[in-house]
Amino acid sequence: MAKRDYYEVLGVNRDASDNEIKKAYRKLAMKHHPDRNPDNKDSEDHFKEAKNAYEILSDAQKRAAYDRYGHAGVDPSAGAGPGGQGFDGFADAFSDIFGDIFGGAGGAGRGRSNVYRGADLRYNLEISLEEAARGADKTIRIPTVEECETCHGSGAKPGTQPKPCPTCGGAGQVRIQQGFFSIQQTCPKCHGTGRIIPDPCRDCGGAGRVKRQKTLEVKIPAGIDEGMRLRHAGHGEPGVNGGPPGDLYVEIHIRAHPVFQRDHDDLHCEMPISITTAALGGEIEIPTLEGMARLKIPAETQSGKVFRLRGKGIRNVRSQAHGDLMCHVVVETPVNLTERQKELLREFEEVSSSDADRHNPKAKSWMDKVKDFFGA
């Protein structure tokens, strides 16, 4: 499984200060510490992941290498490119062995250009329910890194050039002898680039890249739901040594709506009606995303009744089908009554008491169940 971005692991921005990184790590460490979560494998994995991220981002040199090269700049096992060593690294090790024994060229990885794909970026975008339903065009500004215009990405002061790394001779990897085995690892001095920069560029500090704010237009498709991600290929961080750029993933979050609650393509809303309308029936106005609509309420409607308005929900993001609007009836008990209103209600109670079972069937059914329960 590919490693997660260390900034994402700690939940901080790429331009976070050392103090912000430390606070984020402490919070995660306390939450997932093994002493607090015994026998919890997920918490143990989260704890280790946060610890690894903090070890890199809390060290200025390692952080600079990570910002420039991603995991490949700080993890020797990533020297074979994104995703770690994999089968190719295994084959390289045996190639080195047979090369040493038989005097062959060996080291299939020697002289590699150390080209790396740029890191992916993630942006959380909050939109309204109406925008999610109808679609929208949004403009976002994302923090990213771009090639330094002063040194054109070389990292060296104008008029100077990077030099071959004296440790690896420019190969980007070093050979380590372990008994009969000869293996290769990413050079710890140049972090796999095969070069060092004696006179760093003043504008980028030798990184070859600088932090920037990038403006991007994002098209939100109609019907998009909470947590869905929009991929913008090539809008991540630039690659290293001519490698392809990463991608930008825009994750959608929908603000809570004062009237509607969403359930996939369906919408739900509460519909308060008066006792009179519930008892006698009537016609009321209800809100939809397209405007107000009229709904007939039949007589003797009870609280909790659900009316379905077909096609008044949200269009499915992958088809033209629409969800429904579910209106949940809430019969309101009148408040702040005048004396005359109270008198009329008491009068209604008196004239209804002689035939209460017929007028209140649910109450009778409930009382019958209570009597059966107590054996009355």
Curated annotation (Swiss-Prot):
Zn-finger region bounds: CR-type: 135-213
Record-linked SMART domains: DnaJ
Gene3D superfamilies linked: DnaJ domain, Heat shock protein DnaJ, cysteine-rich domain, Urease metallochaperone UreE, N-terminal domain
Gene Ontology MF: a single term: heat shock protein binding
Example GO biological process: protein refolding
List of residues binding Zn(2+) 2: C165, C168, C187, C190
Key words of the record: Chaperone, Cytoplasm, DNA replication, Metal-binding, Repeat, Stress response, Zinc, Zinc-finger
The keyword Repeat belongs to this UniProt entry's keyword annotation: yes
Keyword Zinc-finger applies: yes
Binding sites annotated in the UniProt record for Zn(2+) 1: C148, C151, C201, C204
Spans of repeat CXXCXGXG motif: 148-155, 165-172, 187-194, 201-208
Locations listed in the record: Cytoplasm
Cofactor note: Binds 2 Zn(2+) ions per monomer.
GO cellular component, one term: cytoplasm
Residues annotated as domain J: 5-70
Pfam families in UniProt: DnaJ (PF00226), DnaJ_C (PF01556), DnaJ_CXXCXGXG (PF00684)
Cofactor: Zn(2+)
Recorded domain comment: The J domain is necessary and sufficient to stimulate DnaK ATPase activity. Zinc center 1 plays an important role in the autonomous, DnaK-independent chaperone activity of DnaJ. Zinc center 2 is essential for interaction with DnaK and for DnaJ activity.
Function recorded in the entry: Participates actively in the response to hyperosmotic and heat shock by preventing the aggregation of stress-denatured proteins and by disaggregating proteins, also in an autonomous, DnaK-independent fashion. Unfolded proteins bind initially to DnaJ; upon interaction with the DnaJ-bound protein, DnaK hydrolyzes its bound ATP, resulting in the formation of a stable complex. GrpE releases ADP from DnaK; ATP binding to DnaK triggers the release of the substrate protein, thus completing the reaction cycle.
Family statement drawn from the similarity comment of this UniProt entry: Belongs to the DnaJ family.
Database matches in NCBIfam families: DnaJ_bact (TIGR02349), PRK10767.1 (NF008035)
Subunit structure: Homodimer.
Protein name: Chaperone protein DnaJ 2
